[in-house]
Every structure is written in C-alpha cells, then in structure tokens.
Amino acid sequence: MIDDDGYRPNVGIVICNRQGQVMWARRYGQHSWQFPQGGINPGESAEQAMYRELFEEVGLSRKDVRILASTRNWLRYKLPKRLVRWDTKPVCIGQKQKWFLLQLIGNDADINMQTSSTPEFDGWRWVSYWYPVRQVVSFKRDVYRRVMKEFASVTMSLAESAPKPQNAPAYRRKRG
C-alpha cells in the first residue's frame, strides 16, 4: 500500500526499559542496527500494525509492553535512489511512519527474534537513549532525531525514577 506521494505507511517502535535505555536490534545477517519497524496492512490501524510487528520482529505481545506515547504526526524519510525499486508499480520512494514508545514490562527473556521463518533481526542490546540517532543509517537519521526528541521527556522521567541496572549483559544473541 503506497500513498499518492510514493510513501509506504509504516510503524516504528522504540522499546525502553525501566532505566530509560532503548532496545537496539541488529538486522539479520548484517552489520546495521535499527529500531523495529514495519508496514501497515490495508484495513489495519497503526496501533494494530505496531502490535503485529512487535510480535513478528521481537516476539513481544501486548502483555509484555505498555504504550507510553506515539508521535503526533507522520514522519517521512526518502530512500536513497539506489534502494528504490523503479520497476515496481506504484514506485515506493520512502516510508511515512507513525512511531510508538513502549516500555517493556515483561522480562528481557521474553524477547525472541525467532518468531518467523525469515527473522528481521538476529541480535539486540540495550543502549543509551540518544545512541541510535548517531548510529542509524544516514537516510533515517532525521526521523530518528525527531522521534527521540518527541519521546525524550517521557523516557527521561522513567529513567529518573528507576533503580540503576546491575551487571546487565551488553549484547544478546537470538534465542533458539
């Protein structure tokens, strides 16, 4: 489903823990990292798509998370010309995204990257709140900056009230 301007409707998901860190996931078989995201199917609301993508990509369900916020507006990024599939109709030139900030209320062990035969991610870790803005692929950087600015006050208030983590592992491989 591509809109008239060539953008695919999509949801993005920022998952935070009680310390205000965010989940940073490594794309399957690659060296690139990003937040979970995925397309909105016809007839599906952004929230429904978010829960579907949440399970498909990281194995979490409604009971494992709490919605803290969502972006007020759709945020867009254009794909680099080399990534546009010019031979498909309609041509998708980028994504327009509704973002959700979720708090993990379950355990780290509930995260499972192997819920599909074609997983999106093969590893993940908790990182400091602003880390993804500097590390994401360049064409998504402006959207990430805007998302993180919009969600910052909510996440920072969580971090201020949370106990500090004890000896948390820095990186986790896929379960399976």
From Swiss-Prot:
Statement: the UniProt record of this protein carries the keyword Repeat: no
Superkingdom per UniProt: Bacteria
BP terms from Gene Ontology: mRNA catabolic process
SUPFAM superfamilies recorded: Nudix
The keyword Oxidoreductase is assigned to this record: no
Role played: Accelerates the degradation of transcripts by removing pyrophosphate from the 5'-end of triphosphorylated RNA, leading to a more labile monophosphorylated state that can stimulate subsequent ribonuclease cleavage.
Similarity comment: Belongs to the Nudix hydrolase family. RppH subfamily.
NCBIfam families per the UniProt record, alphabetical: PRK00714.1-1, PRK00714.1-4, PRK00714.1-5
Keywords tagged on the record: Hydrolase
CDD domains the record matches: NUDIX_Ap4A_hydrolase_plant_like
Named cofactor requirement(s): a divalent metal cation
Name by which UniProt lists this protein: RNA pyrophosphohydrolase
Gene designation: rppH
